[in-house]
Amino acid sequence: MKDLLNLLKNQGQVEEFDAIRIGLASPEMIRSWSFGEVKKPETINYRTFKPERDGLFCAKIFGPVKDYECLCGKYKRLKHRGVICEKCGVEVALAKVRRERMAHIELASPVAHIWFLKSLPSRIGLLMDMTLRDIERVLYFESYVVIDPGMTTLEKGQLLNDEQYFEALEEFGDDFDARMGAEAVRELLHAIDLEHEIGRLREEIPQTNSETKIKKLSKRLKLMEAFQGSGNLPEWMVLTVLPVLPPDLRPLVPLDGGRFATSDLNDLYRRVINRNNRLKRLLDLSAPDIIVRNEKRMLQEAVDALLDNGRRGRAITGSNKRPLKSLADMIKGKQGRFRQNLLGKRVDYSGRSVITVGPTLRLHQCGLPKKMALELFKPFIFGKLEMRGLATTIKAAKKMVERELPEVWDVLAEVIREHPVLLNRAPTLHRLGIQAFEPVLIEGKAIQLHPLVCAAYNADFDGDQMAVHVPLTLEAQLEARALMMSTNNILSPANGEPIIVPSQDVVLGLYYMTREAINAKGEGRVFADLQEVDRVFRAGEAALHAKIKVRINETVKDRDGSITKNTRIVDTTVGRALLFQVVPAGLPYDVVNQPMKKKAISKLINQCYRVVGLKETVIFADQLMYTGFAYSTISGVSIGVNDFVIPDEKARIIGTATDEVKEIESQYASGLVTQGEKYNKVIDLWSKANDEVSKAMMANLSKEKVIDRNGDEVEQESFNSMYMMADSGARGSAAQIRQLAGMRGLMAKPDGSIIETPITANFREGLSVLQYFISTHGARKGLADTALKTANSGYLTRRLVDVAQDLVVTEIDCGTEQGLLMTPHIEGGDVVEPLGERVLGRVIARDVFKPGTEDVIVPAGTLVDEQWVEFIELNSIDEVIVRSPINCETRYGICAKCYGRDLARGHQVNIGEAVGVIAAQSIGEPGTQLTMRTFHIGGAASRTSAADSVQVKNGGMVRLHNLKQVVRADGNLVAVSRSGELAIADEFGRERERYKLPYGAVISVKEGEKVEAGAIVAKWDPHTHPIVTELKGTVTFVGMEENITIKRQTDELTGLTNIEVMDVKDRPAAGKEIRPAIKMVDANGKDLYLPGTDVPAQYFLPANALVGVADGAQIGVGDVIARIPQETSKTRDITGGLPRVADLFEARRPKEASILAEVSGTIAFGKETKGKRRLVITPTDGSDPYEELIPKWRHLNVFEGEQVNRGEVISDGPSDPHDILRLLGVSALAKYIVNEIQDVYRLQGVKINDKHIETILRQMLRKVEIAESGDSSFIKGDQMELTQVLVENERLAAEDKFISKYTRVLLGITKASLSTESFISAASFQETTRVLTEAAVTGKRDYLRGLKENVVVGRLIPAGTGLAYHSERKRRRDADKPLRVSASEVEAALTEALNSSGN
């Protein structure tokens, strides 16, 4: 019997579940949850503080107020557990049942649920096929709705106002049924026959032609199918029973002074109960219809306010004029249930304190104040004291700890030994914001932090605070030690470079000790070994910077692991020899034989990690830090005002600039230059002067004169403290020194425009009042920007995490052949990022061949490490196809091969790594460093003259890419395509630079030709757009009549006449319809055709075109027959910084986006409409021509008869990512977005690995739009998950049916987060109400695949160590399947047991 009870007890709480389903609650279900009906609006008796019976806090319904004690006090204590008191009707149980027992209110009249009514799209409206306005008029008793027309002429669902209703009554009597209010709506919903309606809609959709109608019908169809499939009934969207929240979740607390603090919900419930009771009474009294109606409307409004206050009409306010917080408000927003209590909870065993520097700690340690440790580790101490027999009970142990007896400290030290603690600094922007350390007990009250981890935490010691957490369980301690220990986080997950890098004083110390000085003490001596150098230095016989020779023994470990030892004599300095003593064996001496600047140290640590491994690197980093601190102390570097040496040339430079500005001012005064030109010239002048001053200053600071050993005067690098700090990268920059010792330069106004008068003084000289005033602008704007930036950056990170949170590595290899083509990132002739850097840590997708041969040198499936990179560079490969997260075919998650290397560890990524979250953090964390401002093109900042030629920087071979060209008579090539590029490759065939060639560029070199550095290889006129002939023949003018379509202009200087085509607006009536053109004919006057087509060679001329040939002239291939002047592009703002990144990730369509060719073919212009031009592209394959209307003010890059390829730019402007995806495919989109985002970050000097951006892109490309449904159940135009469609298509293909066709869709990150399969994740992100209503109506299941869902339901996340837990749990469950019992089996066992016990 006991086992049976246990079995029954365990039936209630289900531990094992794989999905959560949400649905509509039926009235029966609400009643089944309930423990009784709330009939009175009373809460508690204000004298006795006891809950009123049948009220909102009734103990009979909800349970006792005190543990195991009924209300009247008849039954007390545990022995009466489960007894129901006959006097007060209260069950004797735990008081916490008041947190879980619900009640209900029987509504006297049905009430529509506002979520399904008002949350767009209105579900009730969609089902009933009525507009929201109409339904509201029925619900709020303004109109009648016909429910059953009977034999009358009325229609079902027709609305009648009072007059019409009474007219109908007179006419038809009782033949029809029309009502108002929620009961009418409920009746109509109840009457819907879903099966019949679904069948009708499925027939209707294919017969409809209008797009909007199809959209509407398919929406209804979807909703009806959802209702049918989910087991929800439509009438459940109208409530007849209202559930009541358990009282302890809406507490009422007596304050002193007889007042009460109460949850707003109680007020809202009270209103509902009051109105409901009044309505019941009115109905019993059969009051006049109008009064009842009003009461019903008030009840509807009261319930609306309870469910979602303020959704309809004015929000109901409490006594303090604030809107009351309804049930909907409880769950949404930052303070709502999801974000406040489910996704983030406060934890026990934690403390926080100010941090100070701990320069003596090792990397894995942190200093923990004794007081804090004692408090944090209390339970452990109690346990140890009891175990030792020092205390008999916990109480005694507590007393000992409170008195802080000496033995307590001994026990504490023992407890803390090897028990890691977590340190966290808010804001936690990436995973390195929480790391584990071993605590070291210290006196004082501040936590000590190791200086090298400051960079990861972004911490400094100006009053920052940090929180300490204690991992309690053994597993938690294990994870803290194995995964989160600071020594395991040497590399940054964002870019794979070391993040444990010395900074500031340490860098300065190392730089100081590795500098060399001329004629220092001990110069030229030769030493036998490092120990001897050490001895001599300590004895003071040789200076730190002396140049010496020393014999060293070095151990060099190669990449393949082979170790070579050699002994040699090197030229070095004393300091460098001393530094080499701490370098681990395996690194050559050359790593320290240079001045150690910040970059060099970072490179050294990276190299150390790759060559000798983690443990050695950690020890080395610590040693570097101790050495750096020691020597920066010895150096005695400090700055005084005399270190800022003002250059002598400053006055002269400023004088010259002032004179030139005066000259320009006088030109402006006499009207020779315009205001704009003057402004630009002045600003250019001052920028140049500023640069000159700072050059002079740096030259002055960076060199000093000394006497060498032979007594001659020589120059050496300066030991000026200021210069050393900036040069080493410890603190400060040339720009800051310029403000201190040069001139402050140009300042900006608050609106971002530059003020013409610069600040010529510097901080050493001091600013005048006016100068000071000007410079306050910038400083204030900076502060305002920073505040905005932080909030925006945080929001971007949140959206990124949300979209990528469920992306986890779930398998090793998905087996895809797809990949992205990687080439070096070249911009305007400079290699910004070489190929090696881009493919490092990626897996090769297809075999790489040695250039020009069939030999595979890198097989597919290779994970490219540093060795392979060298190999690829060596073999001068310039393109590689690599696996990418975008192409990964894993259904849930991603595979390790497509992701490649785990950047923070340096090996292939492990299964279970949450790569989505890491990507989001890596992109979001540097967000605060990006700027907020948009840049104006114009002003001194970014003005460049228009390029008109290509000048080669490096010598090499010419390569031409997708360039269509014709050869001119003089042998030069003329480009006749838009997207052509010219590249220069070095002797190994690697591309060093790349240039875009515009249409009409004259190229003076051929493919494969060798050119010298500095040669000009192509030229064009940047101010006009030429029309180039592709064949030779005779020119004939068509429709070119003087003063009707063209006008002749004679140039005064040269006397040459030009023909200019008139604008349509300026032509006389006769010329409006004529389209002037130039036609090419052969010697006999026959039409010539464009090569390879049957299109006659005639070139239509747009307005303002200048014709440079005469009628009947003979011209050759590649000659220019006309030029179209390009108006200088108007200065447009380029969005930079954070807003640009957000725009790209949100996939926003830019204003005036560039227009791309939808199909490949020949361009023609059709009939013009008002204000628009009609562009027609006739495809080469003979399919239907494509037409598009383009506004006339858009400047077109194409003209009649020209061939374009799909996706080529027709009209310039910012690119629209959706167009790129549609026309050029996923790879082109990936390339575009990755490059655009990287440009923003690169400008700020932030390195982020491409794969993080690709990972987010994968999540943005999850959805597809069905183009043809085939034999599938999909509806055309539906958005579906790509994986879902692929699975369905596989199934259809297996059954030899027609598969569905689809196009990829790009969603912005917010949209993608809201359209995930998991409703829990979407609801906890944004628009909670909408997500939940939709999920409830469709009866959605959440399979808890992502991270957020599992956090919300309180399980381990399916990533990292949690992945193992979940797979083990599923395995165990499958093994236990046969042992499961059902409810019916339990019932049978129960009857049997009862029978046997009865006998």
From Swiss-Prot:
One GO MF term attached to the UniProt entry: DNA binding
Record's cofactor remark: Binds 1 Mg(2+) ion per subunit. Binds 2 Zn(2+) ions per subunit.
Main EC class the enzyme belongs to: transferase
Required cofactor(s): Mg(2+); Zn(2+)
Keyword Zinc: yes
InterPro entries: DNA-dir_RpoC_beta_prime, DNA-dir_RpoC_beta_prime_bact, RNA_pol_asu, RNA_pol_N, RNA_pol_Rpb1_1, RNA_pol_Rpb1_3, RNA_pol_Rpb1_3_sf, RNA_pol_Rpb1_4
A cellular component annotation (GO) from this entry: DNA-directed RNA polymerase complex
Pfam families assigned: RNA_pol_Rpb1_1 (PF04997), RNA_pol_Rpb1_2 (PF00623), RNA_pol_Rpb1_3 (PF04983), RNA_pol_Rpb1_4 (PF05000), RNA_pol_Rpb1_5 (PF04998)
Alphabetical UniProt keywords: DNA-directed RNA polymerase, Magnesium, Metal-binding, Nucleotidyltransferase, Transcription, Transferase, Zinc
EC number: 2.7.7.6
Gene Ontology BP, a term: DNA-templated transcription
Binding site for Mg(2+): 460, 462, 464
Catalytic activity: RNA(n) + a ribonucleoside 5'-triphosphate = RNA(n+1) + diphosphate
Residues holding Zn(2+) 2: 814, 888, 895, 898
Family: Belongs to the RNA polymerase beta' chain family.
Subunit structure: The RNAP catalytic core consists of 2 alpha, 1 beta, 1 beta' and 1 omega subunit. When a sigma factor is associated with the core the holoenzyme is formed, which can initiate transcription.
General function of this protein: DNA-dependent RNA polymerase catalyzes the transcription of DNA into RNA using the four ribonucleoside triphosphates as substrates.
UniProt cross-references to PANTHER family, sorted A to Z: DNA-DIRECTED RNA POLYMERASE, DNA-DIRECTED RNA POLYMERASE SUBUNIT BETA
Identification of the protein by name: DNA-directed RNA polymerase subunit beta'
Classification lineage: Bacteria, Pseudomonadati, Pseudomonadota, Gammaproteobacteria, Pseudomonadales
Gene encoding the protein: rpoC
